[in-house]
């Protein structure tokens, strides 16, 4: 039992939750490693949403609201960590939600789908085909999901699938704490923030933006600027960490 007074309470509870979800197949063992890598970058960012990330989240909301067919791609870690926030974002953005896994089995898809449905999320389901040109199960998706999407939100995604979606002409919103990842580098909008904070902020902006703001935010997007901002923020924190 971790006491709430522990200075690392939220971090430890999150790790414990992920470990528990490995027992049901929702989170893969490899997913635990990926989470640890992201958490290290969250330490460097001060475990808070930067002003630059907040602007990226506002642009992400504008892209979802302006899309004809927005889709949120969900993997095991995202479902385990942020099912509540995904439900809020689906309600605010009207985006479709699709389960897509690196380590894919029918059992894992069913377990993750069940968790999401428990939170009131409506899923794109049915037959999948290899619509994304990848030699792996990550290439499998639904015709009415990512195949037809013009904007795809991919939290905690791997770089080659993000690149494949870009190559298909889709705009990609990535949520990734690592500003040096391939995913961040190729995304239309790289959101350098922790997934629950990011999704909650994007959902909030979806309820606040008016049409003029949406048009202005999506007119011209420079994703690399958010990467530079994150790296500069980390550099400044490291220079002053002992002050």
Swiss-Prot record:
Chain segments annotated as transmembrane: none
Pfam families membership: PPS_PS (PF02006)
Enzyme nomenclature, EC number: 6.3.2.36
Source superkingdom: Archaea
Example GO BP: coenzyme A biosynthetic process
Catalytic activity: (R)-4-phosphopantoate + beta-alanine + ATP = (R)-4'-phosphopantothenate + AMP + diphosphate + H(+)
Stretch forming the signal peptide: none
Gene3D superfamilies referenced in this protein's UniProt entry, alphabetically: Phosphopantoate/pantothenate synthetase
Pathway: Cofactor biosynthesis; coenzyme A biosynthesis
A single GO molecular function term of this UniProt record: acid-amino acid ligase activity
Binding site for ATP: 15, 37, 176-178, 182-183
Keywords associated with the record: ATP-binding, Coenzyme A biosynthesis, Ligase, Nucleotide-binding
Uppermost EC category: ligase
Function: Catalyzes the condensation of (R)-4-phosphopantoate and beta-alanine to 4'-phosphopantothenate in the CoA biosynthesis pathway.
Family indicated by similarity: Belongs to the archaeal phosphopantothenate synthetase family.
Subunit text: Homodimer.
Protein name: 4-phosphopantoate--beta-alanine ligase
């Amino acid at each position: 039992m971790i006491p709430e007074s522990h200075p690392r309470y939220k971090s430890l509870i999150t790790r414990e939750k992920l470990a528990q979800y490995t027992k049901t197949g929702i989170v893969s063992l490899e997913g635990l490693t990926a989470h640890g890598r992201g958490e290290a970058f969250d330490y460097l960012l001060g475990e808070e949403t930067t002003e630059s990330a907040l602007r990226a989240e506002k642009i992400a909301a504008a892209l979802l609201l302006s899309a004809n067919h927005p889709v949120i791609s969900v993997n095991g870690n995202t479902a385990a960590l942020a099912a509540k926030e995904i439900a809020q974002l689906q309600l605010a953005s009207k985006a479709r939600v699709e389960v897509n896994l690196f380590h894919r089995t029918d059992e894992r898809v069913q377990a993750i789908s069940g968790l999401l449905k428990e939170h009131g999320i409506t899923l794109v389901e049915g037959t999948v085909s290899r619509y994304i040109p990848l030699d792996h199960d990550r290439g499998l998706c639904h015709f009415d999901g990512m195949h037809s999407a013009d904007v795809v939100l991919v939290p905690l995604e791997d770089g080659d699938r993000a690149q494949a979606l870009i190559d298909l002409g889709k705009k990609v919103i990535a949520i990734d704490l690592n500003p040096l990842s391939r995913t961040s580098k190729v995304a239309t909008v790289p959101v350098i923030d922790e997934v629950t904070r990011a999704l909650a902020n994007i959902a909030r902006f979806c309820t606040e933006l008016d049409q003029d703001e949406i048009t202005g935010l999506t007119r011209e997007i420079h994703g690399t600027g958010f990467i530079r901002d994150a790296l500069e923020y980390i550099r400044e924190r490291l220079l002053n960490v002992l002050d």
